[in-house]
Amino acid sequence: MNSEKIIEVIIAIFLPPVAVFMKCGATTPLWINLVLCIFIWFPAILHALYVVLKD
């Protein structure tokens, strides 16, 4: 893991939609994460971590 990936993980924990936006832009994963973030915070964190770490 390089330093860029570590920063992305930290952002994914504290600001999940921002991390997904940085990784994917304004695409479907961002909207999924925003809905998760509005309703339940913890699944939004898991989804953001998945998006950030899947590559």
Curated annotation (Swiss-Prot):
Membrane topology: Multi-pass membrane protein
InterPro entries referenced in this protein's UniProt entry, alphabetically: PMP3
One Pfam family matching this protein: Pmp3
Keywords: Membrane, Transmembrane, Transmembrane helix
Cellular compartments annotated: Membrane
GO cellular component, one term: plasma membrane
Stated role: Plays a role in the regulation of membrane potential.
Family: Belongs to the UPF0057 (PMP3) family.
Name of the protein in question: Plasma membrane proteolipid 3 homolog
Gene name tied to this protein: PMP3
